[in-house]
A protein has these predicted regions:
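Short Gly/Thr/Asp-enriched flexible loops that form oxyanion-binding sites at enzyme active sites
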Residues: 87-103, 124
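Oxyanion-binding "anion nests"
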Residues: 210, 216-240
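Short, acidic/small-residue loops that bind anionic groups at enzyme active sites
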Residues: 100-123, 131-138
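Conserved anion/nucleotide-ligand pocket segment
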Residues: 137-215
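Conserved small/polar residues in nucleotide/adenosyl-binding loops
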Residues: 241-248
C-alpha cells in the first residue's frame, strides 16, 4: 500500500472543494483565518478554483468541475498535501469524474477530509491503494483556539505523531455560526467507550483501518467503485469503522 510523504517545513497545503466549498459564512471567515494561521506557521497555501464557489447543488460546483479540480490538484505539483474545504451531501456525484487510475500512478499525497469526503478517502485506499486521512476539513483550522484534535491532525500530516486517540470530551452541539465563525469545538459530552460483547476485558486488535461516513459507504455498495472484496483479498487485515453523519459540514 502507498503511504505519502509527510508535509515538510515551508511546504504547500492545497485546498479543494469536491463537496461544499467555503463560499458562505461561517466557513468563509474560518477558512480565511485558517490560511492566515498556516501562513504564520511558515506554510504556503494553494486554493483550487472551487474553494470559494457556491454554484452546485449540495456541492461547490458542477460535479465534472469538482472532479477536474481534485484530479488536477492531486496529480499536479503545486501542493504537497491536500485538505478538503468541507463535507456535504452530494460528493457521490463527483466520484465518476475522479481519475483513480491517474491518482494511483501519481506521486501519493496525503488527502484529509471528513463526512462526504469518504467518497475519496475510502476509495483512495480501496481503488488506488493509497492511504488517506479521515480528519477535519479546512475551516476547522480557523477556530480559536485550536482544539487538540485539530493540532493532532496537522501533526499527523507532518509526521510528528504516529498515534491517534480519544479526547476527554466531544461536541454534541456546535456554537459556530455567522456571528461566531472562529468558535472552537463546543465539547461538553464525556467520552464513553463500550465494548461488545459486554463483559469483555482488555480488547486489542490489529489491522488496516478503513471506513468513513456510513451514508457514503452505503451508497458505494455494489457499484463499480466497490473494490472492498479485492482490497480484503490483498491485505486480509481490514478493520472497518463506520462514522455517523456529522451535522457540521466543515
Amino acid at each position: 500500500m502507498r503511504f505519502p510523504e509527510f508535509l515538510k517545513e515551508h511546504g504547500t497545503i492545497g485546498f479543494v472543494a469536491p463537496s461544499f466549498g467555503c463560499a458562505t459564512e461561517p466557513y468563509y471567515t474560518a477558512f480565511a483565518h485558517a490560511r492566515e494561521r498556516f501562513g504564520q506557521m511558515g506554510y504556503h497555501t494553494q486554493m483550487g478554483p472551487n474553494c470559494l464557489v457556491d454554484k452546485g447543488i449540495g456541492i461547490s460546483n458542477d460535479p465534472a468541475l469538482c472532479g477536474k479540480e481534485l484530479n488536477e490538484s492531486y496529480c499536479g505539483t503545486e501542493n504537497d498535501v491536500i485538505i478538503s474545504c468541507g463535507g456535504g451531501e452530494l460528493m457521490c456525484e463527483v466520484v465518476p469524474y475522479i481519475d483513480f487510475a491517474g491518482i494511483a500512478q501519481a506521486k501519493p499525497k496525503w488527502y484529509m477530509g471528513f463526512s462526504d469526503n469518504t467518497n475519496f478517502t475510502f476509495l483512495s485506499a480501496t481503488i488506488a491503494d493509497t492511504a488517506a486521512v479521515y480528519g477535519p476539513c479546512a475551516a476547522a483550522f480557523g477556530m480559536e483556539p485550536w482544539h487538540p484534535a485539530v493540532q493532532d491532525a496537522l501533526d499527523l500530516l507532518c509526521g510528528k505523531i504516529t498515534r491517534v486517540h480519544n479526547y476527554d470530551l466531544w461536541e454534541k452541539e456546535s456554537v459556530k455560526d455567522e456571528e461566531h465563525p472562529l468558535a472552537p469545538y463546543h465539547v461538553t459530552e464525556p467520552v464513553e467507550l463500550k465494548v461488545f460483547p459486554q463483559g469483555a476485558e482488555n480488547v486489542t486488535m490489529e489491522g488496516r483501518l478503513i471506513g468513513g461516513c456510513m451514508d457514503c459507504l452505503v451508497n458505494l455498495l455494489g457499484t463499480r467503485f466497490d473494490h472492498v472484496k479485492e482490497f480484503q483479498e490483498r491485505y486480509k487485515d481490514c478493520l472497518l469503522y463506520p462514522s455517523p453523519s456529522p451535522r457540521d459540514r466543515g
